[in-house]
Amino acid sequence: DVFIDGVQLYEAPCRDQVFAPVRRTRVRDSWTGTTVPVEDPDVTELVWFAEVGAGAPTIWANFGRRAPASSLVEVSVRPTVFWPSEHHIDWITVRGFEMAHAATQWAPPTAHQQGLVGPNWAKGWIIEDNEIHHSKCVGVCLGKEGSSGDNYATLRRDKPGYQYQLESVFAARHIGWDKERIGSHVVRRNHIHDCGQAGVVGHLGCAFSRIEDNRIHNIALRREFWGHEIAGVKLHAPIDVTIARNVITDCSLGIWLDWETQGTRITRNVLAANCRDLFVEVSHGPYTVDHNVLASRASVEIASCGGAFVRNLIGGTGRLDPSMDRATPYHVPHSTQVAGFGFIPGGDDRWVGNLFFGGDADEAYAPDGWFGGRAHHGLEGYAPYPASWEQYMEGVGESATDHERYFGRKLPVYARSNVDLEGARPFDGEEGSAEIPGECALSVSVRAGGVDGPAGPDAALRLVVLRVALPGDFSGFRLPLPQVTDLERAYYADAEFEA
């Protein structure tokens, strides 16, 4: 990247655009199909382009009206800022730094993942009270090393990335991916912003970690990259990971948990002003989402089974996306040992004591986009799902062979004691839920700045102002406070909810 006085230029697609830059005020979000404002349109006219050949690279830059001779101009080339070159450099604390302007590489789960700062392949790091910003791709990386796979799908083109990702799980086990040697990191009270791919990323190496009290914003807003690895927090195999009390706003996607989301807890986070808030993909649980504010237009996307959503405030849509073309692993509880594989027929979700706001789903997803017409406010998207284990077993008994009985059969949904405000619609199988008509409103604002490290827990949450207007009839309704023992076991892992 190229910077002038700390301002990051845009990378131009060709040299001609350096001399005739195009000012942009809006950009299309490819996942939702919506167009969103560009944060600072004036900066879109500050651009650079590089030609790289056998000799020295040549860089052209347009600094607009800024004078480079009297300014601080930086070309970032370092792949990381704080990163061990060897594995198993354990128990390191990184505290109190400002770290910025790293030329980090794209970090998919099938590659050697690197970030501006991270432990490489190790255990027990604490990354706290730092400001981490303007990384080309990733801010904090808790991810995979290279011997278990390094972009083989791209280099060899013989098998899909999905297959290589499966292989990487077993390859990592052979080199010591377990609780005793890898993971258990803490990422807390950091101010992470303006990264091109993810604020925090990690495959395998993130297991057993805590990500808490961080302020994360302005992630992937330039839409320089397209891929399945982009979010404020993007984790694969977040086994027994806790994501707590973070404030995540102004990202293309807030939190994305992908593969092997098991024993994971997402609790007391505030997500707002994102194109999408929370996406849980091809996982089998058990995972818990509780006491969060999910206030963006697209609040929840579920392409998984085994979730428990408890006492959340959900201001936008929910979207369901079963996946019968990818079987992914689940594990022995609290372990990296693989217990089995399963597809994602949908269902096996629990929704207890949530508050749903209504709205226009076309504002969350463009009608002509990939997911237009497939999102709902409330739980009505579960309409074709059985509402109990008994209903599910009745359907199983009607078929002759195993394939007919089970393949693609939707799993039961357990929904109770939720509240649907004006415009939100319930699942027919809900128990003890309420629809409350009348005007309502929800807004979230966040004060500028980072987090105050010495303030301790909740430092990020203290930046938030939440305003809610509820109908008068709501005052008579009380949301339950269920215990984890009240939640039905996860189907595939056959495991209890413990978090």
What are these regions (language model features)?
Residues N246-I248, G254, T261-G263, T267-G306, ...:
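Long hydrophobic segments that form regular secondary structure
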Residues S135-G232, H236-T242:
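Hydrophobic, small-residue-rich alpha-helical packing segments that form membrane-like cores
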Residues D150-S168, I216-H236, L271-G340:
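Long amphipathic alpha-helical scaffold regions
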Residues K179-I219, E224, G347-Y365, E404-E435, ...:
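Extended amphipathic secondary-structure runs
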Residues D1-W121, H133, C141, S148-W177, ...:
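Extracellular polysaccharide-degrading/modifying enzymes targeting complex plant/algal/animal polysaccharides
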Residues H87, W91-I92, F97, T110, ...:
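Solenoid scaffold repeats with emphasis on beta-solenoid/beta-helix
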Residues P79-V81, A103-P109, Q114-G115, K136-L142, ...:
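Short glycine/acidic-rich loop motifs that flank beta-strands on beta-rich extracellular proteins
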